[in-house]
Amino acid sequence: LNDLLGELNSSHQGFSSFGDEEEVQYAASTMETGILFTDEDPYKVKSIVARSAADMKEVEILPGDELVKVDGIAVDKHTDRSYYFTHPSLDREVKLTFSRKGQPFEVELHPQSFLGDDLYDAWIDDNRRRVTEKSKGRIAYTCMKNMGTQELEHFIVDMTQELNGKDGLILDLRYNTGGNVHDEVLKFLSQRSYLQWKYRGGQLTTQGNFTPADKPIVLLINEQSLSDAEMTSAGFKALKLGKIIGNETYHWIIFTSGAGLVDGSFVRLPSWGCYTLDGKDIEATGVTPDIKVINTFEDKINGRDPQVDKAVEEVLSEIKK
């Protein structure tokens, strides 16, 4: 049925049930540790992902350490590493033995079932460092991973901390998976100064307290900015809040309702289409950037980010005007 729905080429549709046909014959869990290994030697540590299971241990795992045992079983360097970390269910604990300069040491970890959020956060940390270094601290950087209420709260707190004392802003919606808080984000970004006030003997300060639109703003998007990230991007462009840099969005923006069927299954129904003020269907057109910059696979594996670099360049040029 999902294959049939796919032929309609309309996003956010779906069918799910809880019958026997949904059960799989075999399930497996990968025990994620947060340890990244080198490409040249699949058992030699390259780095540790911040805030992951391996980052929480008192015994520090360092780049160059070599994994020699998993739960007491010696690893075979000619065996795919995933063999030792894939089980029918997630283990509560895994014991890893490493060698450092010929000396063995053990680390016990509580493995994770998913590392994606930690990798995303590490990517955000790297982007923020890049922006801070290239702008010499003049530009604030914030990223929204989705358009949910929790991420909205994080965005507002981040803005109150990051934007103060900065001359410009980069908002990153790349890889954003959507939600429904576009209106709140756009309202916050649209705030401009309208008055000044001061306490007796003090200095003049502007009202309101948070006025992002007083400063140059650049929005980053890419081919995996989808759903409500596309609504936010389209609104950002319509309100002329700043330049959009990156690649065209995903073309995946419809709001749905749903219905339960008599057998307990559930179907999602497209209900609200999303259109620009001149009537263009955003699902059909996506949102195109003002300045197109594509990050290649080669950029990624070499630690480059031309989209962020261009955003910094653009904000700095606006600051100088």
Regions found by a protein language model. Name each.
Residues E60:
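Peptidyl-prolyl cis-trans isomerase
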Residues D3, E7-R51, D55-K57:
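PDZ/PDZ-like peptide-tail recognition elements
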Residues S11, N164-K166, Q196, Y275-K321:
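In a subset of proteins, long, contiguous C-terminal domains/tails are tracked
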Residues L1-L4, V308:
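Short, well-structured alpha-helical segments that form the helix of a local strand-helix-strand
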Residues F18-G19, E23, K44-K57, V68, ...:
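Cleft-lining beta-strand/loop regions that shape enzyme active-site pockets
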Residues L241-I245, H251-K300:
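C-terminal structured "cap/appendage" subdomains that terminate the fold
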Residues G64:
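Conserved catalytic motifs of ABC-family nucleotide-binding domains
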